[in-house]
Amino acid sequence: MAQVGSAGPGACGRRGAGAGAGPERTTWRWAPALLWLATAAAVAGDPSRRQWPVPYKRFSFRPEPDPYCQAKYTFCPTGSPIPVMKDDDVIEVFRLQAPVWEFKYGDLLGHLKIMHDAIGFRSTLTEKNYTMEWYELFQLGNCTFPHLRPEMNAPFWCNQGAACFFEGIDDSHWKENGTLVLVATISGGMFNRMAKWVKQDNETGIYYETWTVQASPERGAERWFESYDCSKFVLRTYEKLAELGADFKKIETNYTRIFLYSGEPTYLGNETSVFGPTGNKTLALAIKKFYYPFKPHLSTKEFLLSLLQIFDAVVIHREFYLFYNFEYWFLPMKYPFIKITYEEIPLPNRKNRTLSGL
C-alpha cells in the first residue's frame, strides 16, 4: 500500500525511492544547516492553553495533499496492503535502523547518529518479509519550514507524514550501516490487530514534527513539545504490541532526536488570527521574516548568507517561531539552543499478562 490508509527524508529520511512527478519545489538544503546550527550553538500565551507538553492534535481523516506540494522522491513507491495473517502464524518482529539519506551519503550521517527507524516482519508460514515505516510525504524541509508564496499572505505548509508498508526487507540497506535485529515474536492474530491500529493511527496522525522542545538538556527538564516522526511511530507500534501481549527482548535501543531549548513558549494564534484580515500585521511580518532564510532553491552565496541570518535570529536574538498543531508559538531560545542526540529508549514491557493475544 502506498500509504497505510489514504493519502522523504528527515531525522526519519528514508532512502530515495524514485523521482517524483512535477516541479521539485521541495529541494531543500537544510539538513547540513541543522548540523551546522547545532555545532555553532554549542560553541557560541494563554494560561488555559498551557498543558505541557502540548498534546499532538489528531484529526478525523487525512486530507488530500495540495497539488502545489511535490516530492523530489516518490513516497512509498512499492507500497502494498497489509496482509491478513493466519491466527496461528508466528511473526518475527525486527528493529530496523539505518543512517538518514544513506542512499545519497552512505554512512556519513550514521557517524553523527542521525538515523531512520522502521519495523520488519517475517511470517514463518509463508516465509515472506515485510517492512513498515512512517516518514514525510514531501521530505524534511517541507515538514520543518514553510513556503513563502507571494500570492499568499500566510506561510504555506507542505507537511504530511504517513505510514508505508511493503513486501520485502532490504537486508543490505539495514545491515551494512545500521541495525537489523529480532526484538519480538508475535502471533498472526496479534499482527492483524496491530494492523487495524496502524490504519487508525495513520488516518488521525497526519503531520510530521521535527523538533522536540524542552527547557534544558537536563534530565527531567520541562518538555514543551514532542516530536512526531519515524522513531515515534516505531515506539507507538512497539507499545501497541506490548499492550496486545508481545514480549520484547532485553536489548538496547537508541533513537535520534533533534532538540530545541527554550524558556516557556508563548502561544501566538492560528493562521487566521495571525495572518487574517484582523490579524496582527507586526507579528505576521516577524514570522515571515524568521522563515525567509529557510527558503529552498538558494545559490551558494544566498545559502551562506541565510545561515548567518539564522544564526543571528536563533543564537544572537534567541528567537524561534514554531508551527505546531497548525498554530504558531514563540520560543525564547536558551543555550545550547539546538542539539542532536542519540538516546536510549528501552523496549516496552509486556502489558497483557494473559495469553489472549497469542
UniProtKB/Swiss-Prot annotation:
The active site is at 116 (proton acceptor), 230 (nucleophile). Belongs to the CLN5 family. The chain crosses the membrane at residues 30-46. Residues 303-342 are annotated as: Membrane-anchoring. One of its GO terms (molecular function) is hydrolase activity, acting on glycosyl bonds. The keyword Transmembrane applies. N-glycosylated with both high mannose and complex type sugars. Glycosylation is important for proper folding and trafficking to the lysosomes. Residues 1-23 are annotated as: Disordered. The record marks 42-43 as: Cleavage. This is Bis(monoacylglycero)phosphate synthase CLN5. Disulfide bonds join 69-158, 76-164. GO terms for biological process: brain development; glycosylation; lysosomal lumen acidification; lysosome organization; neurogenesis; positive regulation of GTP binding; retrograde transport, endosome to Golgi; signal peptide processing. It is linked to Defects in CLN5 are the cause of neuronal ceroid lipofuscinosis (NCL). NCL is characterized by brain atrophy and the accumulation of lysosome derived fluorescent storage bodies in neurons and most other cells. NCL is found in Australian Devon cattle. It comes from Bos taurus (Bovine). Exhibits palmitoyl protein thioesterase (S-depalmitoylation) activity in vitro and most likely plays a role in protein S-depalmitoylation.
